Amino acid sequence: MEWKLNLLLYLALFFFLLFLLFLLLFVVIKQLKNSVANTAGTLQPGRLSLHREPWGFNNEQAV
């Protein structure tokens, strides 16, 4: 009887960890899609880019 309880516990733990893994994978894929969509949106040629250099210089000031 006790081995059935252990088996049930291990199966429940296994499926719970599998669920957490798929949830994490889903969140990571969603973030990657969002990141790729954001970078593709800023690289469109018809749209003005609001990209700033990290040190605060504009292209006109650097010349």
Curated annotation (Swiss-Prot):
Kindly report the protein's main subcellular placement as a broad class.
membrane
Summarize subunit and interaction data from the UniProt record for this chain: Interacts with glucose transporters SLC2A1/GLUT1 and SLC2A3/GLUT3; the interactions may promote SLC2A1- and SLC2A3-mediated glucose transport to meet the energy needs of mesendoderm differentiation.
- Where is the stretch described as Important for interaction with SLC2A1 and SLC2A3? 7-29, 51-57
Subcellular location field: Cell membrane
TM helices/strands, residue ranges: 9-29
GO biological process assignments: mesendoderm development; positive regulation of D-glucose transmembrane transport
Disulphide bonds annotated for this chain are: none
Cellular-component GO terms for this entry: plasma membrane
Q: What does this protein do?
A: Required for mesendoderm differentiation. Interacts with glucose transporters and promotes glucose uptake. Probably augments the glucose uptake capacity of glucose transporter proteins to meet the energy needs of mesendoderm differentiation.
Q: Which GO terms describe its molecular function?
A: transmembrane transporter binding
Residue ranges the record marks as coiled coil: none
Biological source species: Mus musculus (Mouse)
Q: Which UniProt keywords apply?
A: Cell membrane, Membrane, Transmembrane, Transmembrane helix
Which Pfam families does the UniProt entry name for this protein? SMIM43
Q: What is this protein called?
A: Small integral membrane protein 43
According to its record, how does it sit in the membrane? Single-pass membrane protein
Query: In which tissues is this gene expressed?
Result: Accumulates in the posterior primitive streak of mid-gastrulation embryos at 7.0 dpc. In the adult, highly abundant and enriched in the brain compared to other organs.
